[in-house]
Amino acid sequence: MIKADFHMHTSFSSDSETMPEKMVEEAIRMGLKTICFTDHQDFDFPGEETPFLFDTATYFRKMKKLREMYRDKIDIRIGVEIGLQPHLGNAYKEYVSSYPFDFVIGSVHVVNQMDPYYGEFFEDKTDSEAYRQAFLETLTDIRAIKDFDVLGHIDYIVRYGKEKEKYYSYTKFSDEIDEILKYLIAHGKGIELNTAGFKYGLGFCHPHPEILKRYCELGGEIITIGADGHKPEHIAYDFEKVAPILRECGFKYYTEFKERKPVFKQLP
């Protein structure tokens, strides 16, 4: 099993109540060697109920303290998950350059100023229309924002569709997805394999293995592994499935990040 989880949330994220210490202790108990905290920093998130923002100076003080405290047991990296929207390029450029992050995930949590987590997004459209809109917005976002290392959970939108994965496949959206993958590869960006899809009952990881295979075929090499856990019990969720999936898709390595630089590790 891969021993590095590079997508993890704590109480610094508005959708988690777990103290960072609890995540570290569970990761050690599970035998992980490396973890990277990637709490949510979503500028201009729609609505006022859940502002996905945290004080970054406080975050770094806490994470550096934990890194020193547990340095003999686990390697703790300090990252962030930024929420991509096309008008936020300058804001994220300034933000990311202001702190010594090890790793930056760029994720699309908002499509056309709406959060697909809520059913209203799907009310006036079919799942296929909604998914295509999300992929097109993703392409717009990554063209507008340069300050991230990997694109998070590419087909995240499928978690919340009315029929979820019933009518979803890579081939149905291959034109849009291929443009996303080609752009990322051309600009030195990677993708992540996010196991939360299994947790949500989709039966596949994010992105779907068909997309992982296509990314590899197109020459993509940078691929991090993360469970997107918000609770200790979700750390390294279903990680025993990851190496076989990656091998089947043509990969020999996975990727970790340190000081914003990719480090390639052979699959176990």
Which positions does each model-derived feature cover?
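An N-terminally biased module of ancient metal coordination in phosphate/nucleic-acid-related enzymes
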Residues: 1-86, 94-98, 160, 167-171, ...
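Extended substrate/RNA-proximal surfaces in nucleic-acid metabolism proteins
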Residues: 49, 54-187
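Charged catalytic cores and adjacent phosphate/nucleic-acid-binding surfaces used
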Residues: 1-10, 20, 31, 112, ...
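Conserved residues at the C-terminal ends of beta-strands
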Residues: 38, 107, 154, 194, ...
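A structural motif
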Residues: 32, 37, 101, 147-148, ...
